From Swiss-Prot:
Name the record gives this protein: Small ribosomal subunit protein uS14B
Sites where the protein binds Zn(2+): 24, 27, 40, 43
UniProt GO BP: translation
Function noted in UniProt: Binds 16S rRNA, required for the assembly of 30S particles and may also be responsible for determining the conformation of the 16S rRNA at the A site.
Length: 61
């Protein structure tokens, strides 16, 4: 889990637009965040396996 202070800091509007960055809406992780879902890769995978994300399914080729 991310530190609460860093999650709160990221939630505020930065003084300069380039300082903004994405965080996972579920756990607060700052890296590997899918913008479309607002989730990190770990949370995205867990929720997809649980069937909580409509339209997402495991692919194989």
């Amino acid at each position: 889990m991310a530190k609460k202070a860093l999650v709160n800091k990221a939630a505020k509007k930065p003084k300069f637009a380039v300082r903004a960055y994405t965080r996972c809406n579920r756990c607060g992780r700052p890296h590997a965040v899918f913008r479309k879902f607002g989730l990190c890769r770990i949370c995205l995978r867990e929720m997809a396996h649980a069937g909580e994300l409509p339209g997402i399914h495991k692919s194989s080729w």
